[in-house]
């Protein structure tokens, strides 16, 4: 392990976070929240000083392999979460350090699960920071760093591969740094467009900004106790549309910018993604029709919740925990499906389910006709065995972590649905689950131990498991 270069990269992260903390400080200044302003300025200063101390370490070698990439990624997300939790503790918004860490990790991983029973009494600076963590984490913290800094040659690709939450689009342009800038350009543009649509619907500037942050990062922190239930149908439809748009592979948007419309529309994953959404909306709309006054109202709530869950955003337009069993079962299944690979959404991803389906079809064909060669193809391209193997290993690790987490959080004594959906909601970065962790409830009743388990799940889910598991391997920490 090249410790020096890992620590050097972490110093850049601390510098970036120090700068980003100035934005909620500005919000506190605008609203006259002087104590909160002081806390954000102090936290920013501490982050900058820590960054300066780490930056003094000079790497003797520029060697940067995948293990450095995995270690940097996992440590980076842990570090920004620790620093990001400080304002919650010092302002008294969440005095318990474990609870503050849970809230911050939930923000950066764009999970949106909260321990707070109510948020409307929080200072505006804290509300801004909660939602802004979604926007920072949505594309990936290290992708943001790569868009700003010319790092060592090997670190570009290995960081991009190790940090899975952002789009994997290193083939768009030759330079990885240029790719990162393109990604953030698209990300920023979509955020601004949504912000303008929300303003046009009568939402105030502050609320529009927080909504755009949460939607863009596919995070679910609300700034109202009932999430989006009290907003107009227009606002709910705008949020629905943009949640779904941010769940699309960003490759498609880049192709649209290049006017390669046919190629963008030919993506099997994107087509499957929209097909799943349409099917789920249709089933749920029919199932909940009797609960609402009109078909249009039922359709709106069904579309909102399907878009929210499959993209792993986690906003709610109603208490879907009160829906019929079939509707809730569909939503739970969507928790595992997730959004497209290369989007800001979480979950297992549509592409992996497509690959599993195609691999199953291949195995069935060869079971019936052993001599038949049945290659697996995605978008017309042959899928190599290494990709299939990696997918299988990911699923095995996912099942193991899910089962272990489910058993551990069950020690708190909650019912099975609560425990199952709490793990599903955190490992898939959804936010709300059912029963005691439903859309109008929170995770505050869990013990500190259970919260730590769920914190691990949120990080593992956002980083697609491997970077977090690498931290527990002794071989990864051996020096050269």
Predicted regions span which residues?
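Membrane-proximal intracellular helices of multi-pass ion channels
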Residues: 1-480
């Amino acid at each position: 392990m090249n410790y020096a270069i890992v620590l050097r990269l972490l110093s850049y992260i601390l510098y970036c976070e120090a700068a980003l903390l100035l934005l909620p400080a500005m919000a506190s200044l605008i609203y006259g929240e002087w104590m909160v302003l002081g806390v954000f300025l102090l936290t920013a200063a501490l982050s900058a000083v820590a960054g300066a101390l780490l930056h003094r370490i000079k790497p003797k070698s520029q060697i940067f392999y995948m293990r450095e990439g995995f270690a940097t990624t996992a440590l980076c997300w842990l570090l920004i979460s620790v620093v990001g939790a400080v304002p919650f503790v010092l302002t008294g918004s969440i005095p318990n350090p474990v609870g503050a860490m849970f809230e911050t990790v939930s923000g950066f991983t764009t999970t949106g699960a909260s321990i707070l029973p109510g948020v409307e009494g929080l200072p505006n600076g804290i509300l801004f920071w909660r939602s802004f963590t979604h926007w920072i984490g949505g594309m990936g913290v290290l992708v943001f760093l790569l868009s700003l800094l010319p790092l060592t040659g090997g670190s570009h690709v290995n960081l991009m591969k190790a940090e899975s939450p952002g789009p994997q689009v290193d083939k768009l342009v030759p330079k990885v740094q240029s790719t990162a800038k393109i990604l953030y350009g698209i990300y920023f543009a979509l955020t601004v467009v949504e912000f303008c649509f929300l303003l046009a619907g009568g939402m105030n500037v502050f609320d529009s900004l927080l909504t755009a942050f949460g939607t863009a990062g596919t995070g679910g922190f609300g700034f109202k106790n009932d999430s989006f239930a009290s907003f107009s149908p227009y606002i709910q439809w705008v949020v629905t549309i943009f949640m779904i748009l941010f769940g699309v592979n960003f490759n498609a948007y880049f192709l649209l910018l290049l006017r390669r419309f046919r190629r963008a529309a030919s993506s099997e994953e994107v087509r499957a993604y929209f097909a799943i959404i349409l099917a789920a909306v249709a089933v749920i709309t029919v199932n909940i029709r009797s609960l609402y006054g009109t078909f249009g109202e039922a359709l709106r709530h069904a579309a909102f919740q399907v878009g929210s869950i499959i993209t792993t955003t986690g906003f709610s337009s109603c208490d879907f925990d009160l829906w019929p069993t079939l509707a809730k079962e569909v939503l739970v299944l969507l928790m595992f499906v997730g959004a497209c690979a290369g989007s800001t959404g979480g979950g297992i991803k549509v592409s992996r389910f497509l690959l599993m389906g195609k691999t199953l079809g291949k195995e069935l064909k060869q079971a019936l006709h052993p001599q038949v060669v049945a290659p697996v193809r995605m978008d017309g391209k042959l899928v190599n065995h290494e990709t299939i193997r990696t997918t299988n290993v990911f699923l095995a690790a996912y099942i193991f972590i899910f089962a272990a987490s489910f058993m551990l959080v069950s020690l708190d004594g909650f019912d099975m649905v609560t425990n199952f959906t709490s793990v599903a909601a955190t490992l898939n970065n959804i936010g709300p689950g059912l029963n005691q962790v439903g859309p109008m409830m929170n995770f505050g009743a869990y013990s500190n131990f259970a919260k730590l388990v769920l914190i691990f799940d949120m990080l593992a889910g956002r980083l697609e498991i491997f970077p977090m598991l690498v931290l527990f391997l002794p071989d990864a920490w051996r020096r050269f």
